[in-house]
């Protein structure tokens, strides 16, 4: 009888251990998909992935972190709507606001970056010396984006109506290629692709300075926030840790970023001057996002006005 009790107790212990392991495995399998966008020069994301900072933050909480490479803001929003992405770790303010206006339950955890000078309109024809020379010309670039907003703001500043320029919908790589081949007159570009155009003989007609801030944000799913209300805060904490690493290890950071982006040391050092990665949401950021929201409504890209301040995770 005692032997049977021992066997029973042993069996019960094994069963309980298996149950605990099963429960632990189940918790560890909770997915947390955080988009990975390394270009044009997203230093925080590159360091977060390479150094395993997100895994270190969320792994102990029972999350299995993945890094889907979805670079399009619209596609990040679609993935979040489908439930396959919980954090859009680098999404344009334009894309997030369009998605929010369409009813997506998405919130702003903080600012990812500001980089007005990295967004620009590049031209190659020597005859195009000013915005006035763009009349009747073809300019290519993605619509419903910061670059689209930049084009309209640049034209408006010089008193030119948007209808006097032919804006062709085109991705940045295709737009730069079309400019270099001579099939269009101007390309809306940013980051390494703008640099590539300049190295190929193009020049900047104007950039976002004084026109748009190029605000990129960290978007989090409302559903994910309800599951874990400190998700946004933890994302910002990791972002700050990546920035601290970059400050403490500048040479290693440049090396890592160069390996991830294919940029030379000189290119990384030149481009990083254009970015402000401070995640703190300032009053100027809210004002910029409000201007962006008005732009989207005026252009028919958003069906309703959404107050950006209402999307902030407090």
What are these regions (language model features)?
Residues 44-48, 68-105, 117-131, 147-148, ...:
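Pocket-flanking alpha-helical
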Residues 31-50, 282:
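Extracytoplasmic "Venus flytrap"
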């Amino acid at each position: 009888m005692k032997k049977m009790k021992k066997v029973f107790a042993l069996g019960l212990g094994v069963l309980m251990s298996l149950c605990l392991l099963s429960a632990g495995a189940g918790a560890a399998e909770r997915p947390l998909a955080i988009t990975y966008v390394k270009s044009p020069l997203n230093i925080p994301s590159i360091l977060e992935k390479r150094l395993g900072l997100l895994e270190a933050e969320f792994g102990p909480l029972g999350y299995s972190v993945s890094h889907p490479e979805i670079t399009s803001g619209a596609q990040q929003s679609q993935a979040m709507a489908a439930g396959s992405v919980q954090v859009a770790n680098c999404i344009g303010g334009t894309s997030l606001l369009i998605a929010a206006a369409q009813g997506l339950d998405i919130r702003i955890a903080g600012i990812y970056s500001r980089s007005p000078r990295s967004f620009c309109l590049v031209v190659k024809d020597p005859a195009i010396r000013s915005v006035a020379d763009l009349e009747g010309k073809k300019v290519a670039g993605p619509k419903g984006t910061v670059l689209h907003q930049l084009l309209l703001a640049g034209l408006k500043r010089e008193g030119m109506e948007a209808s006097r320029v032919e804006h062709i919908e085109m991705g940045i790589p295709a737009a730069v290629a079309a400019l270099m081949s001579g099939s269009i007159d101007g390309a809306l570009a940013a980051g390494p692709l703008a640099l590539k155009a300049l190295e190929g003989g193009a020049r900047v007609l104007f950039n976002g300075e004084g026109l748009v801030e190029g605000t990129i944000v960290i978007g989090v799913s409302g559903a994910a926030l309800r599951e874990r209300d400190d998700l946004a805060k933890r994302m910002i904490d990791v972002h700050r840790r990546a920035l601290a690493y970059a400050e403490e290890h500048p040479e290693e950071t440049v090396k890592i970023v160069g390996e991830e982006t294919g940029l030379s040391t000189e290119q990384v050092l030149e481009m990083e001057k254009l970015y402000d990665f401070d995640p703190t949401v300032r009053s100027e950021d809210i004002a910029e996002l409000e201007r962006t929201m008005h732009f989207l409504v005026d252009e028919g890209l958003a069906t309703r006005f959404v107050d950006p301040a209402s999307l902030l995770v407090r």
